[in-house]
Every structure is written in C-alpha cells, then in structure tokens.
Curated annotation (Swiss-Prot):
Entry's family note: Belongs to the strictosidine synthase family.
Organism, as annotated: Arabidopsis thaliana (Mouse-ear cress)
Protein localization: Vacuole
UniProt-recorded name of the protein: Protein STRICTOSIDINE SYNTHASE-LIKE 13
Phenotype seen when the gene is deleted: Abnormal stigma binding and male sterility. Abnormal pollen exine which is thinner, weaker, and missing some connections between their roof-like tectum structures. Content modification of a broad range of metabolic compounds, such as nonacosane and naringenin chalcone.
Keyword Hydrolase recorded: no
Coiled-coil zones: none
Role this protein plays: Required for the exine formation during pollen development.
Swiss-Prot/TrEMBL keywords: Developmental protein, Glycoprotein, Signal, Vacuole
Cross-referenced SUPFAM superfamilies: Calcium-dependent phosphotriesterase
Example GO biological process: pollen development
Any matching Pfam family: Str_synth
Amino acid sequence: MEKKGQHGTYESMMTHHPILCIIALSVLFIAIDPFHMSPIGGREFKPVKHEVAPYKEVMGSWPRDNLSRLGNHGKLEFVDQVFGPESLEFDSLGRGPYTGLADGRVVRWMGEAIGWETFSVVTSKWSEEACVRGVDSTTNKQWKHEKLCGRPLGLRFHKETGNLYIADAYYGLLVVGPEGGIATPLATHVEGKPILFANDLDIHRNGSIFFTDTSKRYDRANHFFILLEGESTGRLLRYDPPTKTTHIVLEGLAFPNGIQLSKDQSFLLFTETTNCRLVKYWLEGPKMGEVEVVADLPGFPDNVRINEEGQFWVAIDCCRTPAQEVLTNNPWIRSIYFRLPIPMKLLAKTMGMRMYTVISRFDEEGKVLEVLEDRQGKVMKLWIGTVAHNHIATLPYPLTMNQ
C-alpha cells in the first residue's frame, strides 16, 4: 500500500478543508511577522496575564460625570507653547507653574510679559539644535532624541531648600537649585544596574525621596510594550540624601507611575497604569510595609496629587472596554492581535478605545468623592498637565452646583 507523505497530507487538507488551511497559514504568517509590519515590529514580545479587576465590576459602580464638566468648563492654555507638560509645580514663593517638556527642558512661566523661560535641563549634552522640535516634540519623531535630551517627568520642590527634584525618564533622579541651570544626578543606578525609566517622585519630611521606576526592561520610548505585554518589572525606589544611596522598596509592579505621600506621611499612594488601579504602601503604624489596592479604576491612571484636605486627585486615561479585557485575560490572543500588519491606532479603535481625560478625587481609603470628565477628548483653578499634548488645561474649581 502506498503511504501518504507530508506533501500528500497537505494536499488532502487543502482539498477538503481549504478555509481551515488558509486560516492556519495566516495565523502562522502573523505569528512570524516576517516583514516586521506590525506594531511589534520584529521585537521579542511575550505577553502575560496581569491582574485587572473585572470590567463589569468596575464600570458598574463607577460614578460618571454625565455633564462632562472638565470638557465643558476646562480651558486649554499655552497651546503650542508647551510640549508634553507632564507634571506641574509651583515654588514656595508661588512662582510658576514649572513643568517638564518633551524636548528635555524644565520651563517656568514668568507672566504675560516674558512668557515661558528655560529653568533647567537634565544634561550638559542638551542643545536647542539637537532637542527642540516644537509641536513634533510630542510625536514619535522625538523618541530617538530623548535619550540624549532627557525627558523630565516628575517634579517636586523641597519646601525648605527651594531645590527642585526631577525624575527624568532617562537620567534618573536629579536636583537643581532655586536658580536653575543644569541639574545634578543623584540616582542613576540601583544595586549596580541602571534605572531605566524614572517617572515620578515625592519628598518625605525626613528628606528621603520616593520615586517610581516604571520598568527594568523598557525605557520611555518603548513604554507601549510595557502595557501590551503586561510585564511587571517596575519598582518603587527610595533615595536617602545623607548616605547618597538608593534602595528598592517594592518590586514586581506593573507600570508604576504617579506617586504621592499622604498628608501625615504615614503612607504613600502610587498608580499602577497597566493594572488600572491605585495602590497604598504603608510607611508607619501597625501596617508598616504592607501594600493595599485602594481603588480599581475605569482606565489607565497617570499622576496622583494631594489637595489641602489630604484628598487625592488622580488623572486617568479613560476608559477600559470589554474587548480590552479579553486581550488582558488571554495573552495568546494579544500575541496574535498585535502582530497584525495594522497601525496601532486602528487596532485600538477596533477594541473600542477612544481615550479621553478623567480627573477623580479620592479620600484616604480610596472612596471616590468626585469625578470630572472630558468626554470630547479636548483636554483648576485646577492645573492639568498632559504628557502627550501641547497645552496645559485649567479648570475653575470648585465648580458651582449649576455647573
């Protein structure tokens, strides 16, 4: 009897199951991505399942701002004057705001007569010719220059010294004096390895500086891969000025981002962007050293800041979708989906993701006190920075009841 070889089996399958064969070959082609046409672009891509609260559970209980008050009452200021102003700070004399830009500068607002002036840069390698690209600064055209120019993200003033501390995505933790200039590096390595993606910081009353390192594998220019993979190599770090040493406080975090000490500094809050949640880390008391999830969020959180009452404002890129949850829970689908030769914007749109800004106010226990939305995606006085756009948003606050 004649035996069927592999070639004969393949022909038989093509004859009897042509659609299945085409699907199988298509999946194989996509998995290989030979022409590097997908958003992954030939990179090593190993998506994993990560911890996100169920979509229905979060969205079913989340209070919505049906009046879209942020969108209707917020104002866009300094349009095309500031590029990717991530964090906003005022100094102890009330001057500012100060903000870090996508071109590597920290700038300060000097009033209408003068406008914005360069206050500091994070490296002596910075030059206007190499780094300043105007409105293109917040596009991928700037990414290849960020390692040279720097990308200052988190800013905090020391209330007593007036020094400005900077978390730069490429140059780590730095400090610059009240008069500005070139910042001095404080922490670029921890345990002998580079800090790859410093993101935000806060200063404890004892002088220690807590800051987030978003990933040990990807820098800021490749931050989308942190989200797409669901990898959790991020860390919470602490720099101690007296000893000039940096320590790992927490590790295994999924895109740790914004950070804020509580009013009494017994704990700090930080956001985990990938896992869509607000997390508490206890610094004092019977729970010292413990970690708690205080709020599951409807979208991807960025910065967190405190108000005078000890409540917390959290900026969120909203909102999650059911399709996105399917990808989150099924890494193998993600592995195929993001290897499709389709632009990322279209892949996101297919998942129903149309991002807009939500600003939410929480108490110390994670209870939602207020939600402000910009459902039109345009965007206090709340001052609202944005890492991806070329403006600052402000909102008269508090809003009156009829607003």
